[in-house]
Amino acid sequence: MSTPIAIDINKILKLLPHRYPFLLVDRVLEISPRESITALKNVTMNEPFFQGHFPGFPMMPGVLIIEALAQTAALLTFSDERAEDAIYYFAGIDGARFKKPVLPGDQLIMTAKLERDRAGIYKFAVQATADGEIAAEANITCAVRTKGA
């Protein structure tokens, strides 16, 4: 087992192609390459999606929680470096469950565990928590391909 390391926002910006408002990972707290990752997203009232989801009771959309988890998984895949022409596709989801709303002011803690890696196809068990409670969990499949291929 390797020594866990952290990744700051500057390295995240080098590893992921996403940018505001779609970059949904603020920091990697711990990563054990090829094994698991724990990251966080500070959810603020300034998030653009809160304007319409939902007026009077803002909550983070479940699909964006899943996207944040997929970005977290991508960081596990690209923890060393990402080839300039590599793109990370979200390919599938199984068993998604949403158990707690994520609200402004929450700190979303996201974990991804690599379950399988075969021919550029990755399977992960992912989970997001807020205030120590499970907000969402799923099994996701992602693929790394060359842009335009």
Curated annotation (Swiss-Prot):
Q: Which cysteines are joined by disulfide bonds?
A: none
Protein name, UniProt field? 3-hydroxyacyl-[acyl-carrier-protein] dehydratase FabZ
The main enzyme category here is lyase
- For this UniProt entry, which residues form the secretion signal? none
- What's a Gene Ontology MF term here? (3R)-hydroxyacyl-[acyl-carrier-protein] dehydratase activity
**Any idea which UniProt keywords this protein has?**
Cytoplasm, Lipid A biosynthesis, Lipid biosynthesis, Lipid metabolism, Lyase
Q: Decide whether keyword Lyase is in the record.
A: yes
Q: Of which family is this protein a member?
A: Belongs to the thioester dehydratase family. FabZ subfamily.
Q: What is its EC number?
A: 4.2.1.59
Q: Name one GO biological process term.
A: fatty acid biosynthetic process
UniProt-listed NCBIfam families: fabZ, PRK00006.1
Quote the subcellular location field of this record.
Cytoplasm
Q: Which organism is it from?
A: Polynucleobacter necessarius subsp. necessarius (strain STIR1)
